[in-house]
A protein has these predicted regions:
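Conserved N-terminal subdomain of the carbohydrate kinase-like
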Residues: 1-37
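Residues that scaffold the ATP/ADP-binding catalytic core of kinase and kinase-like folds
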Residues: 10, 99, 185
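Short, charged, surface-exposed secondary-structure boundary motifs
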Residues: 19-21, 72-73, 99, 146-151
Length: 185
């Protein structure tokens, strides 16, 4: 862990990397308000079949792009998911910028406005942004925190946002809920 609370990670999925469509409980997916998927688990073969099956039966879908290396590795597939199959997308600014080959954040906003999806982007010290249809919602960071390790902050952010979203909070309130959760890291 560096002094600014950053870290270097190398994931090993173990048996999770062997998930396939037989592991998807269709009834559980149908019963869920939102089916959340992790970019870390997406891969060709069995995992792709599992994602496709879950997406087919889901009421709403959400996915985290998870990591810049995942975006680089699966760029075309992730772009297809974002454009055509997902309802809510979570990413940090670097991940989303890389996904769409944006020059700057204005390009990200312009691209996202045209999708008709909910794009949620964390921006580090710049806070977070949600873009839904043509509207942009911004939320600042919580201050005066003594963060030691940022591992899991994005996961907590997504869980807080989704908690707000399924409980009919506004997009702005859902961003704040995500910020509050990620601040507990």
């Amino acid at each position: 862990i560096t002094p600014d609370s950053e870290r270097t990670m190398c994931t090993f999925l173990g048996t999770a990397g062997k998930i396939d469509d037989n592991d998807i409980d269709i009834q559980a997916v149908k019963n869920a308000e939102i089916t959340f998927m992790e970019g870390y688990l997406w891969d060709e073969g069995g995992p792709k079949k599992a994602f496709d099956k879950a997406i087919l039966h889901a009421n709403k879908t959400a996915m985290s792009l998870s990591d810049l290396f995942c975006v680089d590795r699966h760029k075309m597939n992730f772009l297809d998911l974002v454009k055509n199959k997902l309802d809510i997308i979570f990413a940090n600014e670097q991940e989303f910028t890389t996904l769409i080959d944006a020059k700057d954040f204005k390009d990200v906003v312009s691209f996202s406005k045209n999708l008709g999806k909910t794009i949620v982007i964390t921006r580090g010290e710049k806070g977070s942004v949600a873009i839904k249809d043509s509207l942009i919602y911004e939320n600042s960071i919580n201050t005066n925190l003594k963060i030691v390790d940022l591992t899991g902050a994005g996961d907590l952010f997504a869980s807080g946002f989704l908690h707000g979203y399924i409980n009919n909070f506004s997009i702005k309130e859902s961003l704040q809920e995500g910020t509050n959760m990620s601040s507990k890291i």
